[in-house]
Amino acid sequence: MRTRSTISTPNGITWYYEQEGTGPDVVLVPDGLGECQMFDSSVSQIAAQGFRVTTFDMPGMSRSAKAPPETYTEVTAQKLASYVISVLDALDIKHATVWGCSSGASTVVALLLGYPDRIRNAMCHELPTKLLDHLSNTAVLEDEEISKILANVMLNDVSGGSEAWQAMGDEVHARLHKNYPVWARGYPRTIPPSAPVKDLEALRGKPLDWTVGAATPTESFFDNIVTATKAGVNIGLLPGMHFPYVSHPDVFAKYVVETTQKHL
């Protein structure tokens, strides 16, 4: 049975969270769009294999919209890691496996490096290290124009499966419509420079598994492959592109379970 509720943390964030199962903790950190419904099917599949799975909407996004502006502006990996630790504290999650894609990937690596006593292992997918002007420049547009542009980008360029993306439903897409401007103004200019992957020695030997999308153009995240290889971090592929938990939830859940089991 899944718990769906809210909880507040001392930093002023009221988090919407979901939790299912019993066993070792697995935490699924959303990408920059902040919407945990993307993990809906995978949560149950992972929990069924003997884990307690927790996920949440990110500060300022979707059902965690009640949050101080500083938690969703000039966002960095390190800030996000501190916010995630605050909700783990509130939920009494002391030691967890963490997954994250995009800004979530930066977050889980920052958690692994900054809070090693709290993290069993981390899985990161398509971690952004480069400024992309065509995304950063949307910040100056009106909200509606930002949402229109980014909805098209997500569906047609990076979803990895347009049918699965659309199938998330009207309520999810209505929340994403509101999240796109928050992301455009708070994430693209500050997340890539904060990527916690510059110190290769700091990554070496850490319980970290790295993936990119099998259908993502190689040049998009080639730097991920190079960095992981140089640091001796396991690098692999997941089907689809930027959102494997939406396009291929069964394969994603299996990957999370099997990777976590290696570290128990």
Swiss-Prot record:
Could you cite one Gene Ontology molecular function of this protein?
hydrolase activity
Against Pfam families, the record matches this protein to: Abhydrolase_1
Q: Which GO terms describe its biological process?
A: response to toxic substance
Coiled-coil annotated spans:
none
Q: What is its EC number?
A: 3.1.1.-
Provide the reaction this enzyme catalyses.
zearalenone + H2O = hydrolyzed zearalenone + H(+)
Keywords noted in UniProt: Detoxification, Hydrolase
Q: How does activity depend on pH?
A: Optimum pH is 9.5.
What mutagenesis or variant effect is reported for residue 126 to A?
Answer: Abolishes the catalytic activity
Annotated active site: 102, 126, 242
Question: Which residues of this UniProt protein bind zearalenone?
Answer: 32, 102-103, 183, 187, 220, 242
**Impact reported for residue 158 to D:** Strongly reduces the catalytic activity
Hydrolase among keywords: yes
Q: What is the effect of changing residue 153 to H?
A: Maintains the catalytic activity for ZEN but shows a 3.7-fold increase in specific activity against alpha-ZOL
Query: Taking every annotated instance into account, which residue ranges of this chain make up the domain AB hydrolase-1?
Result: 27-207
What's the family? Answer: Belongs to the AB hydrolase superfamily. Hydrolase RutD family.
Give a short account of what the protein does: Lactonohydrolase that specifically hydrolyzes and deactivates the mycotoxin zearalenone (ZEN) and its zearalenol (ZOL) derivatives. ZHD101 prefers ZEN to ZOL as its substrate, but ZOL, especially the alpha-form, shows higher estrogenic toxicity than ZEN.
Q: How does it assemble?
A: Homodimer.
Name of the protein this chain belongs to: Zearalenone hydrolase
